[in-house]
Swiss-Prot record:
Key enzyme in the regulation of glycerol uptake and metabolism. Catalyzes the phosphorylation of glycerol to yield sn-glycerol 3-phosphate. Sn-glycerol 3-phosphate binds at residues 11, 81-82, 133, 242. It catalyses: glycerol + ATP = sn-glycerol 3-phosphate + ADP + H(+). It comes from Trichlorobacter lovleyi (strain ATCC BAA-1151 / DSM 17278 / SZ) (Geobacter lovleyi). This is Glycerol kinase. Pathway: Polyol metabolism; glycerol degradation via glycerol kinase pathway; sn-glycerol 3-phosphate from glycerol: step 1/1. ADP binds at residues 11, 15, 264, 307, 408, 412. Signal peptide: none annotated. InterPro entries: ATPase_NBD (IPR043129), Carb_kinase_FGGY (IPR000577), Carb_kinase_FGGY_CS (IPR018483), FGGY_C (IPR018485), FGGY_N (IPR018484), Glycerol_kin (IPR005999). Keywords: ATP-binding, Glycerol metabolism, Kinase, Nucleotide-binding, Transferase.
């Protein structure tokens, strides 16, 4: 019997999971790594530490499963997106720390491009907004600020990649410099309609084409691991950015199917099939995956503070000792008692995109308790999700029939039930909650025939629990109305 190894390289830790043919986790290892904050607004990672931690957990996960490298049929990779690495092709060494997706150092450059009237051009071609979040301006910053970097890039001596590219380069001993289409679509440099690097956008950001990786399908044998890393050379055959991998792992393979990942923030993706839907409501259009010549697309929206709001209750207010306690505390009251929290600690994401919004707690009376604040915090996660979903349904002209969910906060039954009540459709939690890693495993396995097709995969997907809506729609409409009032009060608070 053989197995698939999924490498799940995240923002705070590197993980590796071994899956069997039924999609069951047989081995898991995880290692955190340093977060580097040179100054406010700047976030970096040591790319070599990322590689070392990822290789270490890969070996450990296989050992914990009681297996050897000879038992691994293929490797799939999923990764934190947008985080930018540039390295020297000859030495294989990064020329600077990785600039993380959270980093805001290129805000002024994005503003400059907007003033030049270029946002519509970037949006139409890439499906993205001009924001420091994405890789393109990070890469331009590195070339502009590191002595000699631009000259080396022009001579083809440097390589750029998101984390998937960096891992593949190292796993193959420097033989392959590539990225999959889902990761390429997060760079601000990739034309999602033509499926290639956009030459005009490269010129606008002064990016030499020689520095870019080859763009490949999300499921294909790209190469094998170098012999020195494992006792056997293992095919690398699947890559997707973390949120696209979760969409694939949730088997959202038909237009209109939606998944929401509840983590520090929330990431919602709606599968739109082979049709890229350009949003009129501030959502992102992204490549979901490329399978052979077929490219599938998704609408995406993000919530900046979901689990982070619960962490604030723990670390900022001290009204809970662990994040798990929030459900118990929230259940001490029958409803929110008129209390609303807008957790805009770092502004508001889609569909509002207001960087100047700030956290707002409204409706407090002498009768308000810690339970009301805890409940308002959980409800804020569901409200923000509902805002995203409403925008997606309108953009895609496709009504939702169910929401598939994953991520740590889905263990909170009170939140999941309120989410179902608010949306008016079932919220479905899968049996296997490691959907991001599972998506990478599925992509890798399909490429080598470990699984034959998506029909076979769909038979593996099982719901652990479905939360059906039970509260009246009129009551939900009233809560949404008050939530919208609270959001409007939070907007623009930090405007200079």
């Amino acid at each position: 019997m053989s197995f698939i190894l999924a490498l799940d390289q995240g923002t705070t830790s590197s993980r590796a999971l071994v899956f069997d043919h039924d999609g069951t986790v047989r081995g898991l290892a995880q290692k955190e790594f340093r977060q580097i904050f040179p100054e406010p607004g700047l976030v970096e990672h040591d790319a070599e530490e990322i590689w070392a931690s990822q290789l270490g957990v890969a070996v450990e996960a296989v050992a914990r499963a009681g297996l050897s490298a000879a038992d691994i049929a293929a490797i799939g990779i999923t990764n934190q997106r947008e985080t930018t690495v540039v390295w020297d092709r000859r030495t294989g060494k990064p020329i600077h720390n990785a600039i993380v997706w959270q980093d805001r150092r290129t805000a002024a450059e994005c503003d400059r491009l907007k003033r030049l009237g270029l946002e519509a051009t970037f949006r139409a071609r890439t499906g993205l907004v001009l924001d420091p979040y994405f890789s393109g301006t990070k890469l331009a910053w590195l070339l502009d600020h590191l002595p000699g970097a631009r000259d080396k890039a022009e001579r083809g001596e440097l390589a750029f990649g998101t984390i998937d590219s960096w891992l593949v380069w190292n796993l193959t001993g420097g033989e392959r410099h590539l990225t999959d289409a889902s990761n390429a679509s997060r760079t601000l440099l990739f034309n999602i309609h033509e499926g290639n690097w956009d030459q005009e956008l490269l010129q606008l950001l002064r990016i030499p084409p020689a520095i870019l990786p080859e763009v490949v399908p999300s499921s294909q044998v790209y190469g094998e691991t170098a012999a020195r890393f494992f006792a056997a050379r293992v095919p690398i055959s699947g890559i997707a950015g973390d949120q696209q991998a979760a969409l694939f792992g949730q088997l959202c393979d038909r237009p209109g199917m939606v998944k929401n990942t509840y983590g520090t923030g929330c990431f919602m993706l709606m599968q739109t099939g082979e049709r890229p839907v350009l949003s009129e409501r501030n959502l992102l259009t992204t490549v979901a995956c490329r399978l052979g010549e077929r490219t599938e697309y998704a609408l995406e929206g993000s919530v900046f503070a979901a689990g982070a709001a619960v962490q604030w209750l723990r670390d900022g207010l001290g009204i809970i000792r662990s994040s798990e306690e929030v459900e118990t505390l929230a259940a001490t009251v029958p409803d929110n008692g008129g209390v609303y929290l807008v957790p805009a600690f770092a502004g508001l994401g889609a569909p509002h995109w207001d960087p100047y919004a700030r956290g707002t707690l409204l409706g407090i009376t002498r009768g308000s308790t810690a339970g009301h604040i805890a409940r308002a915090t959980l409800e804020s996660i569901a409200f923000q999700t509902a805002d995203l979903l409403e925008a997606m349904e309108a953009d895609a002209a496709t009504p939702l029939t169910e929401l598939r969910v994953d991520g740590g906060a889905t263990a909170n039954n009170l939140l999941m039930q309120f989410q179902a009540d608010l949306l008016g459709v079932p919220v479905v939690r899968p049996r296997v909650r490691e959907t991001t890693a599972l998506g990478a495993a599925y992509l890798a396995g399909l490429a080598i025939g470990y699984w034959q097709d998506r029909k076979e995969l769909s038979r593996l997907w099982q719901a652990e629990q479905a939360f059906a809506p039970v509260l009246e729609r009129e009551r939900m409409a009233e809560l949404r109305y008050n939530w919208n009032r609270a959001v409007e009060r939070s907007k623009g608070w930090a405007q200079p």
